[in-house]
Amino acid sequence: FFYIPSGSMENTLQVGDRIGVNKFSALFTEAKRGEVVVFGDPDKWLGDAPVSDRSSFVAKIKSGLVTVGVLPDPAKQYLIKRVIGVGGDNVICCDATGKLQVNGVSIKEPYIYKGDKPSDVKFNIDVPKGFIWVMGDHRSASADSRFNTDSAYAGMVPLSKIVGRATLIVWPLGNLDYISKGSDLKKVPVKKLP
């Protein structure tokens, strides 16, 4: 399970939500457009990892839960974002109507935080094989691929950094729900890589 610490994925995910993540899917299939994925920080997008006090009783319990895989390792910083582009895709912001385009197809994004634009940052990128381009649903509050183009991977996330696909909000119970996959992105034609 993973904890949502920020509002970068609102309104799909709320601060404090706990989500179920399918880690096995990342081992056998590549991420698809529209999926919400958890991934390890590819190049210090979050800055340096926080130092924790391991001497307290609670810290020892948490450490044990990390060891058996129930909790994520806090020393490994994780992010959660929506996959917009996969290897071979061309992603552009924005078309004449202000929508993102993937492989020349303008997409509807009903999951974007109300009042946000698809992006205030213009870009035209080609996603290389073995990488994804990700964006938070709360575009004005998400430090995602758009804001990390000067990093080692030019804002892309290597597939090897993906921990799994977010599938279900499990806590609080009032938020219990499946996580949407962005159906409009499924309509985008696949570009064949040479």
Q: Which residues fall in each region the model found?
A:
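Soluble "head" domains of membrane/secretory-pathway proteins
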Residues: Y3, N11, V15-P194
